[in-house]
Each structure stands twice: as C-alpha cells, then as structure tokens.
Amino acid sequence: MKEKAESGGGVGYVRADQIDLKSLDEQLQRHLSKAWTMEKRKSLSDGEDNVNNTRHNQNNFGHRQLVFQRPLLGGGYSNNNNSSKNDIIRSTEVEKSRREWEIDPSKLIIKSVIARGTFGTVHRGIYDGQDVAVKLLDWGEEGHRSDAEIASLRAAFTQEVAVWHKLDHPNVTKFIGAAMGTSEMSIQTENGQMGMPSNVCCVVVEYCPGGALKSFLIKTRRRKLAFKVVIQLSLDLARGLSYLHSQKIVHRDVKTENMLLDKSRTLKIADFGVARLEASNPNDMTGETGTLGYMAPEVLNGSPYNRKCDVYSFGICLWEIYCCDMPYPDLSFSEVTSAVVRQNLRPEIPRCCPSSLANVMKRCWDANPEKRPEMEEVVAMLEAIDTSKGGGMIPPDQQQGCFCFRRHRGP
C-alpha cells in the first residue's frame, strides 16, 4: 500500500518499530466513536424525512430498505422522489457492482497499525480467518472538508477499487474486498465493536509479511543482493506490469515503495490509488501523476503519456534493485525534474553491472517513449539473462578493483 514516504517533499517513511501501536489504536477508536456519534445525531435530526423516503422506496427497491440514505459510489446521494428512469437503472447497477467487491464487515477484525498516511492508516487485520492488511481512509470529521473534496476522495477510492478487484495475478497484491462507510455499518477491533462512520472507508488486501521492497533494499544496502535475486525480483515486477498492461491498466506510480514481498519473497505490485484504464486517445492522459525520481520525462513535462511511463519507472526500479541504493541522492526534486527533462539525467550504471542488464535499464528509460520496449519484451530480455556466473553489485568493502560509482550527472 502506498503511504506518503520520501524526504524533501514533506513525506516520510513510517518505521513500525517507532509507532506506539496501542496508543494509535486507542486514538482511532476515539475518533471513530466521535465521528459515528456526530453522524448519528445528524441523521436523527433528518430522520422523519428520511423515513418517509424509505417507506416510499420500499415499494420499488427491495434491496435498499435503509432508514438513512446510503451514499452511492462517487460521493452522491440518491433522491428517489425525483429520480428519472435512467437514474433508477443506474442506481440499481451501482448496487449490483458494489456486491461484487463489498466485504462483510462482521467478518473483519482490525488490529494494530503498521503504517500511517495523509488520509488514513494501514492496519493488520483478520478477514474471515485470513491475515489481511486493512487500509482505512479517513476523510476528516464533519465540516473539515467540503462536499466537493469528499466527493473527489470518494471517486478516487472507487476508482482504486474498480481497477483492483478484477485483477488476478501472482505478482499483483490480491484484492479481497472493500467497504464504503455508512451509518448502519460496524467494524470489529480487538477491543470490541463500533460503528463505521460515512467518512471512513476501507480496502482489504492480502497481508505481505515481507514489507515494502524499498525497506528490503535499504536493509541490504551494504551487502547488496545476489545477481540471481536481482533478476528474480525484477522478473516478478516485470511480469506484474506486463499483466496490468495486458488489462489496459497504467499503474502510473511504479516505485519500490509500492511493491510488497510475501513470506517467500515473491514481489507483488500494490497501491492502485492513481492507476487508471489506458485512454484510447493519449491526449486524455496528462498531468503529473507519480513520484519524482521515477516519473518519465513526458509526465514531468505535462505531455500526453501512455503505459510506456510505467516502463520508464520500471527502468529506475531495476537500477535500484541492482544497486540497493537511491537514485539522485544529492539532488533536490526541482533539480531532478529539470535535469531529467532537459539534460537527459539518468542514474549512473555501475561498471560491474552486466551489459545484458544495463541494456534493459537503458532501453526502459529512453527519453523517447516509442523506443521503450513493451513490458512483455522486458520479461523476455530478463529471462534470457544468465545468472549462473554471478554479476551482482559488489559491496562497498569489496570494491577494490571495481570502480562502481561516479558522481551523478546533474545540473
């Protein structure tokens, strides 16, 4: 799951060993209880009108017999007294689509916090007896955000769910289900059961105990990875991206923070918060979406882009997996942006890197998107690399005869 992560841009990594899990869980319980109470009071004040609406709706919608109106996907509320025939059909379709991915909250138990982000927290949990990760999105207490802001956040949430719930691949984190917050919904914690207010939603996915790939690379920064492991991780990522592209999905935020490792160290792509279906017209896909350092020149430049922006980001990740280091450590975000677009800045490839792997990096981060390979071809190139003779990055204390790093080219 993606969490705000990097330094220099107002975001940072969350170290789980420095989190007071008990305190955070208590804070979450107090916040949810407070928000639920506020929601209930507001609903009761409008109860008479809503009850009348519900009685009217019971004649037409047997599956929506709720005392309080339930928010539709995308943030709006149904107004059945004034709905046109098309609105009724669309509402029914939304309810049907919801059932495809909506979880049963009574089967979900939320446990300790493992990460925190701008709009919520990631918890360990149990769903129907299975270990899971639960992403709780909290859009703020009543009155703290405008209706338009909340609608936008809900739309982003439903976009992530719409993309994720249809995917099935060993290198993509398995989506289990999600829930939109409603007044009649409740969730369980280790300390009991409480209401889930309408400003809180959750996404439930498989739990990957190996954590983020970024953290794994940081831990192995000094000793580096065996070349065979480098290729295995890179192939996992390449196969996952190739699958996404075959489904017409552009991830748009490919980086090592968004890759998770399971107990067998299989890499799985996570966080589809900014993913979207690829537009048939490339001019429909514009805007700076992603993370600086991994973003392709055309994205940084505000030009139209397509799935090849993921290929560029993969090239940066490939370098990072091989080197177990950060690209552009001495440059600011603004310097990176300018140099990548105007000076063709790329990470310095170590001399000890086998030419077969270096060639993959260079092709993937070519400035011209049309010259970058498809991810299917990248998979084939990586599969063809011989790992039997080694070729991994040489640790710093063994680099006597191998000049592996030079200063980064920069502005």
Swiss-Prot record:
The modification Phosphoserine is found at S43, S45. InterPro entries: Kinase-like_dom_sf, Prot_kinase_dom, Ser-Thr/Tyr_kinase_cat_dom, Ser/Thr_kinase_AS, Ser/Thr_Kinases-Pseudokinases. Expressed in guard cells. Keywords: ATP-binding, Cytoplasm, Kinase, Nucleotide-binding, Phosphoprotein, Serine/threonine-protein kinase, Transferase, Tyrosine-protein kinase. PROSITE patterns: PROTEIN_KINASE_DOM, PROTEIN_KINASE_ST. Residues 108-385 form the Protein kinase domain. Binds to CBC2. Associates with PHOT2, BLUS1 and PM H(+)-ATPase (e.g. AHA1). Serine/threonine protein kinase that phosphorylates proteins on serine and threonine residues. Collectively with CBC2, acts as a negative regulator of stomatal opening, probably via the inhibition of plasma membrane-type ATPases (AHA1 and AHA2) activity in guard cells, but in an abscisic acid (ABA)-independent manner. However, at low concentrations of CO(2), together with CBC2, stimulates stomatal opening via the inhibition of S-type anion channels in response to blue light (BL) and red light (RL), thus being a key component to maximize photosynthesis in the light under low CO(2) conditions. This is Serine/threonine-protein kinase 54. The gene is CBC1.
